[in-house]
């Protein structure tokens, strides 16, 4: 890996304020082609990407998300787990492929495919000088997003991505990640609780200092406090039902 690519990836951070400058069609096509170059399990290509250009559709998706940058960006992509085309093949072949793509394994395979495509696009966009932010908030109301985007059975909207030129007011920076030794295990998982807690305490201090410096003392919470707040909430408890309605996790 060249130092350029390494540094580009290391400098990644979410951008939430964009200039009012739409991406051109050629740029959009290049980003999608970069995404399609990602690895795909067994050549299944279990994804579709919806480019949302209609302001009225973006506005409706913003209502679901609650985030202004769903509307105010250079371009909005929605990444869809897609077995609909495989279902069409199955209807002709009559080989009962639904047993596979309607399973939990099928869901995992498809979700991984979509994530790889999206990350390829994110890196390509940042290489072009654009900023990006992922939008998991589109899952706040999956049924409504499916209706807005006219999604058929055997498809599922996983997340979105807003792309564009960062606003002059944008001052984001990379957040400190967990230490290498905390997430990289040699040969077997190291579940030593004492060591893990010790490393987390040190990391919590790093994160707290990061927020304190960036916000001039307004925020001082650490990583453990953040995940306690986030994972302590009961959110999107309808997800299993919505997945089943779309044809997934049937077995």
From Swiss-Prot:
Matching Pfam families? Nitroreductase
Per the entry, which co-factors are needed?
FMN
Write down the EC number.
1.6.-.-
InterPro entries, A to Z: Flavin_OxRdtase_Frp, Nitroreductase, Nitroreductase-like
The entry's keywords: Flavoprotein, FMN, NADP, Oxidoreductase
Keyword Flavoprotein in the entry? The reply is yes
| Superkingdom, natural source | Bacteria
A Gene Ontology molecular function term of the record:
oxidoreductase activity
What family is reported?
A: Belongs to the flavin oxidoreductase frp family.
Q: What does this protein do?
A: Reduces FMN, organic nitro compounds and disulfide DTNB. Involved in maintenance of the cellular redox state and the disulfide stress response.
What is the protein name for this chain? NADPH-dependent oxidoreductase
Q: Which organism is it from?
A: Staphylococcus epidermidis (strain ATCC 35984 / DSM 28319 / BCRC 17069 / CCUG 31568 / BM 3577 / RP62A)
Q: What is the lineage of its organism?
A: Bacteria, Bacillati, Bacillota, Bacilli, Bacillales
């Amino acid at each position: 890996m060249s130092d350029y690519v390494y540094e580009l990836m290391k400098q990644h951070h979410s951008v939430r304020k964009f200039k009012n400058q739409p991406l051109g069609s050629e740029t959009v096509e290049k980003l999608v082609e970069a995404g399609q170059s990602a690895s795909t399990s067994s050549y299944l290509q279990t994804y579709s990407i919806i480019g949302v250009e209609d302001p009225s559709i973006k506005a409706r998706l913003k209502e679901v998300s609650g985030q202004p940058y769903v509307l105010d960006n250079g371009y909005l992509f929605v990444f869809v787990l897609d077995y609909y085309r495989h279902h069409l093949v199955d209807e002709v072949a009559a080989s009962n492929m639904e047993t596979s793509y309607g399973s939990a394994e099928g869901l995992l395979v498809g979700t991984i495919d979509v994530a790889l495509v999206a990350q390829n696009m994110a890196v390509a966009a940042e290489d072009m000088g654009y900023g990006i932010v992922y939008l998991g908030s589109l899952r706040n109301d999956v049924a409504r997003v499916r209706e807005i985007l006219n999604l058929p059975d055997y498809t599922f909207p996983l997340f979105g991505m807003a792309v564009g030129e960062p606003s002059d007011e944008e001052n984001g920076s990379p957040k400190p990640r967990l230490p290498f030794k905390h997430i990289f295990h040699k040969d077997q998982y190291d579940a030593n609780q004492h060591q893990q807690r010790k490393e987390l305490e040190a990391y919590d201090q790093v994160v707290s200092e990061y927020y304190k410096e960036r916000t001039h003392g307004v925020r001082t919470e650490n990583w453990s406090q953040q995940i306690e707040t986030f994972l302590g909430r009961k959110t999107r408890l309808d997800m299993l039902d919505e997945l089943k309605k779309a044809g997934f996790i049937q077995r």
